[in-house]
Amino acid sequence: MLPLQQAREVRDSVIEYIKATYQFKEKDVSDAFYRFIEDKNDGLFKGPFVSLKPPFVSATEEECANIPLDITPSFPPYKHQLQAFRQLSMKNGHSPEPTLLTTGTGSGKTECFLYPILDYCYHCNQYERQTGVKVIIMYPMNALASDQAKRLAETIWNDPRLKDKVTAGLFVGEGIDAKEYPRTMGSDHIIENRDAILDTVPDILLTNFKMLDYGLMRQKFMSLWKGNIETEQKALRFIVLDELHTYDGAQGTDVANLIRRLKLKLHIPKGLLCPIGTSATIGSGSDSKACLCEYAMNVFGETFLEENVIEEHRIAVDDYVDVVSNGIPDGKLIKECVFQNDDTVDTYIRRICKYWLKNSEASPIEAGISLRRMGIVRDLLFVLKDGILSIDEIQNKLEDNTEFRRLRQQHNEKTCKIAIENLLALIAYSKRLLANGKTIPLMYLQVQLWQRELSGILRYVQKEPEFVWRGNLNKDDERIALPMYFCRDCGASGWISRRLATDDRYCSDVKTVNTAFAEREKEVYLLNTEMKR
């Protein structure tokens, strides 16, 4: 994978699609429009931006030997995963603690709560199956639920202690067709048939806001709560909100109300249902944890302490990179490493391995070993450890590296950019070998490309075509800018406005015009420069 090249291809493909779709009749309008959206600094796209971080700290052998769970992962957990296992364990009478997981992408947030909840379900059903939903996991999108369902199925199926003893159901509004949706657990699926879910009542319920709401309201779904609603010993002990940060504003209020209704319906006292939230990484402010805890308390209705927030722990850059040489080849060789139109991923990687690693056949593991000895890689990690940067920003911040500064002085900025792109491609290619024989990425590399909505484009009401983003309107500019329209049949374009029968002029308020257009009001007009006064 070449993330930077992929970002460019995505950008170019979108631009070409827009050009094929918006074929303006007027050449001056077409030229102005495409200059506007392709502008490097203020066009349709922002980026690409790069994020690069060292791996997470793993638990020690001694810590792995003392995980307070019987159902444990087959891999050495990260330090933050071990912390979650300890907080959520129910071993030896320990009460699971409210938990907020704020680790980064690729950190195994799901595994943080997956093994503790499987451990709980295993012990409930170890000798005789205890009826009732024991865990609810709520997702903001069905696609996320479906993806996690497959991972959950594989984990249960591959553990003989869980297979045929612990069940899970996907309750997201589908599953009515008995032929299409599975009624039993499998190696790559959980129970998805709605009737089977209601009949068997799975231990773990993967759902969304809408279906959990229906599950509490509708009589036909009341069988879901067998083992909880009519007994003092409640089976339900965990509720998980995936992507907790997405539940903001009115949606957050709705979810908070739903959780309180769930507790009321099942007569669950405060403190019995353990809340778990997964979230994006939090800010570095002194009150960031306190703010997150307050937010979680409002949503779950349970008490969260700052020590309940689990953050990531990454290997220090100097501990991860043992510099032997700077690693930057001669500028003339770097110029040979530019990505060509006829390159495949393999030919490109082989070429940069040849010039950067002096081994065109380097395996991902060998490449990783070499990169961890380069001073330029260490400096790149230091530059990117606190945030995301554009290629230009990375280039400017690498000036402290003597060889990189010399490369810039002796050649040009283009050569420096090629060098950065080569490094990122090598990092994406490289792997690290674990003690158990598995390989993982050498470092955590992300490339982000931001795209604006075309609906945010306004056109100034004037003869010469000129466009502006809605968010960039200058209050001191007396010119009027309105939403634009384009006709796919004839290529005509112009402005959208609104005028009531009682008005003597067209409306210039963008929000009013957009609302009228969306609601298909009859007072909406399409205007252009060819209209007669």
Which residues fall in each region the model found?
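Conserved D-loop-proximal element of ABC-family nucleotide-binding domains
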Residues: G249-A250
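Helicase motor interdomain insertion/brace
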Residues: M1-S89, G104-S107, L114-M138, A149-T155, ...
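Active-site cavity-forming subdomains of large catalytic enzyme subunits
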Residues: E243
